[in-house]
Amino acid sequence: MLLKVSFASGKSFTPKKSSLFHFRYPIFAVSVLFILDYFEKKIFNKNNYLLIIIFTIICFLFLDAFIQYIFGENILGYKILNNRISSVFGSELILGSFLFKMLPIILWLIFYLEININKNKNYLIIFFSLYFIVIYISGERTSFVLMNIFLFMVVLFVVKIRKILLISLTLLVLFIALSVLENFGKSDPFNRIFVKTFNQITNNTILNNKINLSNEESAKIKENIKKNIQIFSTDHMGHYTLAHKLFLNQPIFGAGPMGFRYYCRSVKYDSEVGICSTHPHNYLIQILSETGILGFIFYFSGLLFLIIKILSCTNRDKLLKDKNCFLIISIGLFVSLFPLVPSGNFFNNWLSINNYYFLGVYLYSYKKVFN
């Protein structure tokens, strides 16, 4: 489909070779499926060594992140940047994103390896409480929002681990309240995630005006707020405006994969309409602008398929373990592709590896439940 879009977009700014090699990701997803099948049927002895290794690495990140949060720098000497905790990732600022993307895999492994949840209840509560807190203190707003959407859906559909996650979320809320009241730590994630986001969405209208609900000026200020409402921020609105222009130029096939970036390069990042960047910072907007209506049909159909299968899975007469595994990875894949939050570049190598890895695990779990 991407090849079709690239070559059909006659005036596309996208080098065709950027789409020629995208086929490696579907191959990667199928490879994950075959590897899981092979290990299950041939040599895989279900022990929890892999989970122990992952838990150890994650716990190290917890410790390092808290050291950076409390003292201002981590054990490697990396300091807090832009009010965000990054731990060993340094200037990359992807700690929250990394942890969020690992969360579905960890939960999937817990069910796949048949870990005794009741026996390890207290350990799991401590682990997931710290997990959610570290995503919060990382200051990554998108990861924090997606984590909450993911957890809401898991709590709704996966009964087995519902209580543990709810207790962990309660402890997260208590931590947020305590950190705001006591003001400890060298960064202020509450301000970044909640206050700054609100000010960006309202374009600082409330920040710049004192609202008195008892006078006539209040009505004018409220009207001004409505006029200045932004989708996430002024920059995001600028990206979406430019993406809308590219979509209108070629609505069927779009500007081609990575077309937003190459258009911005062609105008030296000084577009007459909107604001240039490397990508539109939203999956839905990017797919519409770069792959057009054709790409949108595939994207929307994929999300709809995931929702339908999540709902139908609950009625399948299969092992509870297999159903829980399928629900976890389905929700993880759906939330990773969620269209209503800021996002990275859909065609980015790291994100593509993550999404197609999820797809490979999804295909494996799908076979267990629906075949």
Name each model feature, range by range.
Residues A219-T291:
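Long extracytoplasmic/lumenal interhelical loops at the membrane interface
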Residues Y123, F127, T278, N282, ...:
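Loop-to-helix entry and N-terminal half of a specific, functionally important transmembrane alpha helix
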Residues L63, I67, V158-K227, T241-N249, ...:
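A membrane-periplasm/extracellular boundary helix in multi-pass inner-membrane enzymes
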Residues I27-F34, K46-I80, F89-I161, L166-L181, ...:
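Alpha-helical transmembrane segments of multi-pass inner-membrane proteins
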Residues V5-A8, K41, Q68-K79, L113-N116, ...:
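Perimembrane helix-loop junctions in membrane proteins
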Residues M1-I27, F39-N47, D64-L93, Y136, ...:
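Interfacial transmembrane-helix termini
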Residues L151-F152, G302-F305, F326-N371:
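Transmembrane alpha-helices of multi-pass inner-membrane enzymes
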Residues V155-F157, I161-L165, E290-V335:
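Hydrophobic transmembrane alpha-helices and their immediate junctions
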